[in-house]
Amino acid sequence: MTTRRSRTATDTYHHGNLRQALLDHAVELARTGGPDAVVLRDVQRMAGVSNSAAYRHYSDRGALLGAVTEYAESRLADAMVARLNAVPEKGTKAKRAVDRLRATGQGYIDFALAEPGLFRTAFAHTETGRDTHDRREIAKSEVGEHHPFQILMRTIDDLVAAGVLSPDRRDGLDEAAWAAVHGLSTLFIDGPLSEADAQRKQLITDRLLDAIAVGLR
């Protein structure tokens, strides 16, 4: 009589699937617990594979967390682009440019509220060894056009092209706008504004975006 061998988790991974499976498990840990929850040994256990098998794909926790950070950044960018794509193609060029900037900020805050664990992980660069001192260079050289900061930069470039923002006031606005929406996002998920209800949070968001828009002129 032939005994049928049960399939183990290790049996199911082949042709490079293990790397993606490890990343998927790590993303789920980050989603529920933020960057501190991403531990290579835990991910290896979830996948049901040996330490050596996991280390062939991610040499240490920093490598795994770096991959999750890139994933989280990409999802944040997706949320911003979704808001941008919803901006109606009507009104003056100047109005559309301002509306697109507001949409970018709204998408950023939307993501923080919907995915706080991934949002925190998107900024865990110090734990991965990635340099974060110059976000402009990171956006241009490491991850290309689909990066949250690059998306923000383009919407601000559109403001200059539309005549809303004078070129001599362009420098530094990327970082200022980013600081504003990131700061509010952090207050919403980790700070004293975390207890505010959804309606109150949206009101505060609207006021912040109003202030940014007024400051452009």
Enumerate the language-model features and the residues they cover:
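Amphipathic alpha-helical packing segments from all-alpha helical-bundle domains
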Residues: 95, 131-164, 171-175, 203-214
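Base-recognition residues in the alpha-helical recognition helix of bacterial helix-turn-helix
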Residues: 55-59
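Amphipathic C-terminal alpha-helical segment
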Residues: 111, 154, 158, 178-196, ...
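Amphipathic alpha-helical segments used for helix-helix packing
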Residues: 113-135, 186-194
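Append "Primarily bacterial transcriptional regulators
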Residues: 41-46, 54
